[in-house]
Amino acid sequence: MTSFVKSKADELATTAADHAALIKGAVDALNTVAPPALTISAQDGRRDADLAEDGWTDEEAAFVGRNLRAAGLSEDQIQRLLNGEKLTDVPVGVQEYLHMFYGNLDSDELFSLKSKFDGMETPDGASWSRALGQGLVTLSNENVGNNAGYQYLPSWVRDWSENYNSNDGKRIRDIDVPLAGLIGNSGSAPPGERFGTELIRKAAGGASRSAEDSGLLAPESNYGNLHDVPDAARSKYEETIRRFLDVGGRSQVAATAFLTGEYADGTALVDFDRDDMVGYAFRHDWNDGGAAAGSLVDWIRDYGGSGNPTNVALADRAFSGLFDCTTSTGGDNTFSDLMNANSSGDAIGKINPHLAGALREASLPYLNILVGGDSAVYGHSGFDPDIPPDEMQRRTARLFTLIASDNTYGEPTAENPDGTGAGADLYRDILDQTVRNGATAGELAASEPHRARSLAELSANLRALGQSGLYGAEYDLQRDEDANTDERNDANTKVRNIVSSASAGLTAVPHPAAIGVGAAGTAAAPWLLPAESPGDVPFRPPTVAGGGGTAAEDEMHLVYGALRGLETTPEPGTLAEYWYREDGQLKPLAHILSEHKGDSGELLSAMERALGDDDLLESLRAGTSTGNHQGRMNFDPTDPDNYDDMILNGSD
């Protein structure tokens, strides 16, 4: 009997264990099929917000933190947002939860919750704090489902966004500083177009004045010397506006609205002076070397070269606004302001070298168009400035001057450890574009022979304006240095001597200093000139990494590209045999140049003969001649007044 009872008990225990396992499996499956994000609703958002009424207890904060984390976006979703995609896989309950949660908290309640999370000093607390910032940024993005966007933000956030008084000390202390801390800790989630634009505007407005003038400090501490601002307050102010710029700049559509003064639907930004605001953002002495400011434009390269029609169109819009704003000499002359950004006359590239690099990045998809190429032919019909050709030439020279104004001279700096300046990088890019243009000319030699001349023309024009930009930046820098000395009366003479030495590499007429440096009858590029110059004035142009030296070497990039496009086979016993690898492919031009022991002009002639196509060669030569003329026509580097009159101040 006892054994019977025991066996039945064991049987029941086994059955119970089996049922328990089934229940656990069902629960686990439920969690897999319906993760926490799917169970969150608008009611949960209101309930969680109501917990703030009597202050946040540890348990309440932890409860809300877990819900916020559950409502967060995945890394994949964030990346798709950054790519400009519309998210259709964010549960409606999550969208409504965020709306109700943030919408039922005032600013003090929200900021106190962040303080609660941060004060925990635990991994969970840090994770919840980040989820809190990310949730607000996510709610602002109209690409998150159908229940998010600027209009879904709390009313106090929208009121703050539309307060454009950058001298409102109370607002800065009570809202700006803690809000920047909140959204600055939001991972990489991008804001929506409107909110992102307002964040960039806040940053630019803040950049227009110093911490001393902003009213950041409490009124009682503003007595006495207004410039005795504690370092901590000044640092906090800079950190605040940089965070707004960083978060706002995550949105390419917001950056485009800021650069153009219009939202994507064509609506103009309210109370917005585009030139002033962009100028504030670019001229400010950012403590990150202009990295955050550069994020407003550096994405243009990737979008412009993506081949995605939507992204290309956005890049074209943004670059159109950037080009118009930064190169204009009409009205208040924004270009002059950017070249003289502070009381010392420093250019933006010297103040913010990362910004100069970002301008270079943004310009790369448009190099051929900047010197007269057809926008539609080169895949950027959205960038088609309605500007006369001669003014387009001058504007391009101004853009290249801004890029070259970073003033590194090839020396390593904290911001640029490899020692390559943006201007030097730009000229290398121009030579690379020359190779690509040559390759296209070679590929089309049989089907579209007329294209060779236009491609050569664009390439030569581009090289000329690139050199003009290098010269313009150096001229401006040395003029600024002279203005800071007591030798003002000697400044004009000194600058004329500098111009004389630089002109050897910028004109077709050989300068005595260039003879022996380049091929006979050709001019050396300006960075190869010796330090000595007329009047013993040192000229310190940057060094081009891997770039050309003599004019012959610069032109060689075009012919080399044509050889690559033609896919010719070298004749046995000729110099050309040494230019090819065993697999029949051309060696990199840098290798060919380094292996060649003779004159660069001789090598250029050998490459021209190797083309084996007299018509193609004639077209390349004719286009190069025309392009060189165009590049010099509106910028005479032998005349020091030319920079002031035509480049800095605009044409008459």
Regions found by a protein language model. Name each.
Residues 1-228, 237-241, 252, 565-652:
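Intrinsically disordered, low-complexity charged segments of secreted bacterial virulence
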Residues 89-92, 96, 108, 123, ...:
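Residues within HEAT/ARM-like alpha-solenoid scaffolds
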Residues 94, 99, 114, 147-149, ...:
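Generic intrinsically disordered, low-complexity segments enriched for polar/acidic and small residues
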Residues 102, 249, 259, 282, ...:
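Ankyrin-repeat helical core positions
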Residues 213, 258-262, 373:
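General "foldedness" signal
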Residues 249-253, 507:
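Sec-exported extracytoplasmic/periplasmic mature domains
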Residues 254-284:
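Short linear, low-complexity motifs centered on an aromatic residue
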Residues 288-652:
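Long, contiguous all-alpha helical interaction modules
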